[in-house]
C-alpha cells in the first residue's frame, strides 16, 4: 500500500517536472529569440518545442504519463482512458510545473518582469487575426496533436486475444510496437504544429503553457479563447481516435 502511494506521488512529481522542463524550454526559446530579434525566431521556437518534447517523453515515460498537456489528459479522462481523480491530479501537476517554469524564466530573464510575461503570454499574431481565426487555429492544432498522441500512446491499437493469449481474429497480425517511436512521433508532431499557427494564434495548443503566464501576469485577455479552443479541440481529437478511427476487428 505504501509502495503504491509512493509510486503515485512519484508519478505526479514526474509529470510536474516534465511540464516544468517543457515550459522552461519553450518560454526560454520565445523570450530569447524575441529579445535577440532573431530572423529565424519561429524556426528556433518550433525546433525547441519538438526536440524538447522528444527528450522529455523518452526520459519520463517510465515514471509518469508524460503528457505535459492538460488537453491530452482531459481527453483521456472524458474518453474513459484515465480515472477522473487520477487525471485531475495530473492536470494540477502540469499546471504547477508550467507556473514554476515561468518563475524560473523570470529569474533568468535579462529584461523586466512585465516585459518577460508580455513576450511569453499567448496572444493573436500581429497580422490581423480575429477571435474566430484564433479559436479555430487552436482548435484544429490541439485536435491534431491529441489524435496523434492517442493513436501512438494513449490508445494504440491492440488486437483482441482469447484466454490463451491467442488472437481472436485468425488473420490478425502482431501490431506494430510504437513504444520506441511514439516519443519521436509526438515530438515531431509538436514541432510541425508550432509552425502552423504562426500568423493567427501563435501556436500554443497547450492549456498549461497558455495559462501559466496569464496567471503570473494577471492579464486575462484572450485566455478564454485559447483554453476553450484547446480543450474542445483536444476532446474532439480524442473522441475521433477512440470511437471513429480506432482500427476495427473483423470479428
Curated annotation (Swiss-Prot):
Motif NPA boundaries: 69-71
Subcellular location field: Cell membrane
Motif placement: NPG: 206-208
GO cellular component: plasma membrane
Superkingdom to which the source organism belongs: Eukaryota
Residue ranges that the UniProt entry lists as topological domain Cytoplasmic: 1-11, 64-86, 155-179, 246-251
GO molecular function, one term: water channel activity
Chain ranges passing through the membrane: 12-32, 43-63, 87-107, 134-154, 180-200, 225-245
A UniProt-annotated Pfam family: MIP
Location (main, coarse): membrane
Free-text function comment from the UniProt entry: Water channel required to facilitate the transport of water across membranes. Involved in osmotolerance.
UniProt domain comment: Aquaporins contain two tandem repeats each containing three membrane-spanning domains and a pore-forming loop with the signature motif Asn-Pro-Ala (NPA). In microsporidia, the second signature motif differs slightly and is Asn-Pro-Gly (NPG).
UniProt name for this protein: Aquaporin
The organism of origin for this protein: Encephalitozoon hellem (Microsporidian parasite)
